[in-house]
């Protein structure tokens, strides 16, 4: 939700927002490590639990949302003829992180029986801060882009949204919400599904491949959308493909009957990879779709509000999946 509340900060000053993101993300990571350590020294400590929630959930959340928004508009300004490709590159890293960071975290954890998990958070806090601060220093808008000065009246978000029928924006928000909810519903059950089809020993490999599809979907679908007259078409394509793959698996009883059946295993894996790609593609196409409708003037703020759909989907997607047999 931090993206929804801090979109205006990103809009006004990307250097300030990227610095806020760097500091809060690293601080939240280090704070989480500290409270894990504190909890190890004081068994059953409520303070430790509260501290972890605040650091990992709230402080890191501010860094995550603000950092996610900061480079998007800038890249669209630099590559206005290839906005989809530009935003795809920006958010592909978000999807690829699972493939890159997971094995590194596993290596840092090592034998976690010694109760030194907190060290991983301290190390990651330093690494992430260095990388994010480097990005903060390099981030810059094109010299020919004019941002309204303090003396110039800039329309508010609602004024911008009202330039089109409000149902237009509501439709985009709902479409994005459904895309993310359905994606999270399957992705949250990914490991269990892989085990059900008899590939328990390959969970890590499949998880890495699905992360690559996630990142590839962010890049591929957004770049593809650059060639389309209407970016809504890419969402229709994602939904049709996702429904088709789901229908094939459901009609063949793939998940329940796949163990030992190579064809059904392929169907199930194809579904997992397709949903990951569509989930990523949904993310990368939102900012460019919004810019096509509402222009670039307040895109960071509007994009931030739209990402509230991601927050709500995070609350409901896993709940939906847990209630489906």
Each model region followed by its residue ranges:
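A late C-terminal transmembrane helix in Major Facilitator Superfamily
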Residues: 89, 98, 279, 291-325
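Structural signature of the two symmetry-related core transmembrane helices
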Residues: 16-31, 233-249
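Intracellular juxtamembrane helix-capping segments at the cytosolic ends
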Residues: 65-79, 86-87, 280-294
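Flexible cytoplasmic inter-helical loops of multi-pass small-molecule transporters
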Residues: 140-158
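Extracytoplasmic gate region of multi-pass secondary transporters
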Residues: 102, 165-223, 283, 287-290, ...
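Hydrophobic core of transmembrane alpha-helices in multi-pass small-molecule transporters
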Residues: 28, 43-66, 177, 263-281
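Helix-loop-helix hairpin linking two adjacent transmembrane segments in secondary transporters
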Residues: 94-143
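Helix-to-loop junctions at the C-terminal end of transmembrane segments
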Residues: 2-14, 218-230, 325
């Amino acid at each position: 939700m931090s993206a929804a509340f801090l979109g205006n900060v990103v809009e006004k000053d990307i250097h300030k927002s990227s610095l806020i993101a760097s500091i809060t993300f690293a601080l939240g990571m280090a704070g989480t490590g500290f409270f894990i350590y504190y909890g190890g020294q004081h068994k059953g400590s409520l303070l430790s639990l509260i501290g972890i929630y605040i650091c990992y959930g709230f402080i890191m959340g501010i860094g995550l949302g603000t950092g996610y928004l900061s480079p998007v508009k800038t890249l669209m300004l630099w590559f206005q003829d290839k906005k989809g490709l530009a935003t795809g590159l920006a958010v592909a890293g978000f999807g690829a992180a699972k493939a890159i960071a997971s094995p590194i975290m596993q290596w840092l954890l090592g034998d976690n029986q010694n109760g030194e998990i907190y060290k991983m958070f301290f190390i990651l806090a330093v690494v992430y801060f260095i990388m994010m601060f480097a990005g903060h220093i390099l981030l810059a808008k094109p010299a020919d882009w004019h941002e309204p000065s303090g003396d110039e009246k800039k329309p508010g978000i609602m004024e911008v949204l009202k330039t089109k029928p409000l149902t237009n924006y509501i439709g985009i928000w709902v479409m994005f919400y459904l895309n993310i909810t359905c994606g999270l519903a399957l992705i949250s059950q990914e490991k269990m599904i892989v085990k059900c089809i008899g590939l328990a020993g390959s969970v890590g490999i499949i998880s890495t491949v699905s992360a690559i599809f996630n990142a590839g979907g962010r890049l591929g679908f957004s770049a593809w959308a650059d060639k389309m007259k209407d970016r809504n078409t890419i969402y229709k394509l994602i939904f049709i493909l996702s429904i088709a793959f789901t229908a094939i698996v459901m009609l063949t009883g793939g998940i329940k009957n796949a163990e030992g059946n190579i064809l059904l295993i392929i169907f199930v894996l194809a579904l997992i990879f397709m949903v990951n790609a569509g989930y990523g593609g949904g993310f990368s196409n939102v900012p460019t779709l919004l810019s096509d409708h509402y222009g670039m003037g307040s895109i960071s703020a509007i994009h931030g509000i739209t990402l509230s759909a991601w927050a709500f989907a995070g609350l409901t997607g896993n709940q939906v999946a847990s209630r489906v047999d």
